[in-house]
């Protein structure tokens, strides 16, 4: 099986071009290839498929084999692959995902290849029952939550997948590998949840760390950064346009009032290609 390793600011996935080959058991394959010691290494597996509704279709699987709805950095890299490898030569590219169609604007380098992308991440979902969160109020804004023997304030947003945003004074001091899985598996979240700890540097700048549902600690999370942009406005901590510093690099986010959509801009990198034994 031919594969390509790609990353968006360190959020890395193994990509399989299913225009040219088929994958029989993507869940098992995701677990095998994602292993950083015995596999290729990555946060999961992304299949690039034909689509009847858009230019291409994306299916993503987390490192534990569970299927996810959407990955912001993953869809940006998929758009780069599709354009650079001739699967779709339109700009913008429309990608069908389990969370809906995403439109990606491409920024090309001097050789005509994709260097960076801007994704229309769509409208955030703010209603608790649709995120979903087991919470009696309509929205989950600064809700008290205990984890790791600490009390936090949590704001929840869905960008096609559920996110919990928690603001702290010093993000580096958070015991992420302890409290991340505890919050992810909290009964409040029937589908589990992605967890983000955020430190506000200014109204237009934050730094954040992520525990991804099904993958653990990751260097970046595009849907998570989008949720952080929305949560900042809901809590009054940031404006509608921010730069998010993640361990793997920076993303620029904007939640536009004009159409209620979130836009995310960042680089997309093809690392290497190879053959995985069948």
Task: Map each language-model feature to its residues.
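N-terminal, positively charged, Ser/Thr/Ala/Gly-biased leader segments
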Residues: 1-22, 119, 136-148, 152-157
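A glycine-rich beta-to-alpha transition motif near the start of alpha/beta enzyme domains, typified by
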Residues: 1-113, 164-278
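Juxtamembrane transmembrane-helix boundary motif
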Residues: 92-94, 101-103, 107-147, 151-154, ...
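Glycine-rich beta-alpha junction loops
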Residues: 123-125, 159-163, 268
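Selected transmembrane alpha-helices and immediately adjacent juxtamembrane segments
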Residues: 154, 162-165
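Membrane-interfacial helix-loop segments of redox and metal-homeostasis proteins
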Residues: 157-159, 181
């Amino acid at each position: 099986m031919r594969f390509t390793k790609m990353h968006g600011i360190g959020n890395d996935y193994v990509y399989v071009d299913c225009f040219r080959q088929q994958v029989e058991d993507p869940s098992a394959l995701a677990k095998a290839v994602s292993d950083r010691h015995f596999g290729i290494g990555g946060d999961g597996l992304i299949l690039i498929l034909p689509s009847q509704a858009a230019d291409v279709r994306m299916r993503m699987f987390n490192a534990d084999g569970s299927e996810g709805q959407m990955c912001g950095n993953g869809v940006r890299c998929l758009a780069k692959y599709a354009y650079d490898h001739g699967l779709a030569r339109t700009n913008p590219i429309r990608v069908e995902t389990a969370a809906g169609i995403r439109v990606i604007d491409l920024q090309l380098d001097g050789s005509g290849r994709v260097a960076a992308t801007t994704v229309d991440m769509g409208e955030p979902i703010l209603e608790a029952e649709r995120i979903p969160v087991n919470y009696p109020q309509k929205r989950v804004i600064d809700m008290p939550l205990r984890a790791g023997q600490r009390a936090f304030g949590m704001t929840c947003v869905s960008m096609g997948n559920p996110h919990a945003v928690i603001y702290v004074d010093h993000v580096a001091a958070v015991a992420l590998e302890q409290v991340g899985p505890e919050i992810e598996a909290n009964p409040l979240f029937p589908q589990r949840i992605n967890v983000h700890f955020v430190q506000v540097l200014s109204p237009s700048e934050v730094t954040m760390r992520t525990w991804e549902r099904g993958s653990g600690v990751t260097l970046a999370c595009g849907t998570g950064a989008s949720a952080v942009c929305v949560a900042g406005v809901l809590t009054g901590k940031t404006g509608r346009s921010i730069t998010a510093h993640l361990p793997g690099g920076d993303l620029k986010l904007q939640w536009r009032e004009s159409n209620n959509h979130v836009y995310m801009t960042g680089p997309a990198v093809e690392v290497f290609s190879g053959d995985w034994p069948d």
